[in-house]
């Protein structure tokens, strides 16, 4: 797997059009490479940026480990309305749509190239129209006032420690402001309630984290979640489920 090249200083902020010596910067034309990737039960063709300043250019190895876990626990996510944060190339969402027929929306930084590339990868792998997409920069106001996704997922998004507070702010909003699309539906049966207890709550954030960072940095995110009224549970294989703390729920 190639190593992603990026400029951390340019993340989540606009760059000046003029360099420090007053000369205008030349715009470079974006280049891509298409790769075939093996997923459980299928092969996906994914177009990746040769370089992207927001680090959305490559399909990271952790995605494949997360996919294996999701396939093993497919009954926990089938039938859920899902939002993926930090979709990058869109490969994970495309896989879940094709294998589980999951109702899933992609999301990433407000960058048109990212959205266009996800749409391209959807079409390339037989998903038309393309999956719905939400442009959102962590920490900013979310463009949807009453989100109805009962499952939020992400893979390998804890790379930049300075963005943890913004990510937690977005997560808190999505979990606390969740409004079920099926409020008028028939109540769950006892069997369904039992399955929910041993599976994933609604709403929940399910995250896989495979890239290795310092323990202190990693703990900053999880302790930040706890401080925000969220509970963190390790589900095994470095997959974490984050949900509203019961006392927080009751105060909403």
Features from the language model and the residues they span:
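S-adenosylmethionine-dependent methyltransferases
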Residues: 1-252
